[in-house]
Amino acid sequence: MSSKILFILHLPPPIHGAAMMGKYIQESELIDSSFDSYCINLATAGSLSDIGRTSFKKLLRYVLLLKHIYHVVRDIHPELVYITPNAGGKAFFKDFIVVQILKCMGYKVIVHYHNKGVSAYQSKWVYNFLFSR
């Protein structure tokens, strides 16, 4: 039996760099043949113009996302969770909560930042402190 891995990724739509990388991971035959893999879309934005904006609809999507992640990890008990969070802005804090919940539940978590936001936010003490968590 192969290892269970849960991938929590940004997937299109909307189409942007991190979402395309997530799609490549989701569709990888090598990953699929090597692991018992599951994917969850981390995105709460429905379009490019929705990125960076706050709305009740996105808040509701986020609450439903947290509930979905909880149920999936409880049902499949993955040996590893691979997540591609945002590296800055409000979305960083949204994704940070997901990572912390998974860690509190006892799961091994690999955090992979795809964008260049880490260098832009690393000089800010709050982000720098949270990056190390």
Language model features by range: what are they?
Residues 43-61:
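N-terminal beta-loop-helix "entrance" segment that forms/cooperates
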Residues 86-91, 105-125:
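A short, histidine- and acid-enriched strand-loop-helix "catalytic/donor-clamping" loop
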Residues 127-133:
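Structural recognition of alpha->loop->beta junctions
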Residues 18-19, 92-96, 123-124:
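Conserved strand-to-helix beginnings and helix N-cap segments that scaffold or border functional pockets
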Residues 54, 124-127:
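Short low-complexity, flexible loop/linker segments enriched in glycine and/or proline
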Residues 1-45, 76, 106-107:
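N-terminal subdomain of nucleotide-sugar transferases
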Residues 56-73:
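Glycine-rich, highly charged phosphate/nucleotide-binding loops
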Residues 65, 80-105:
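An aromatic- and histidine-rich active-site surface loop
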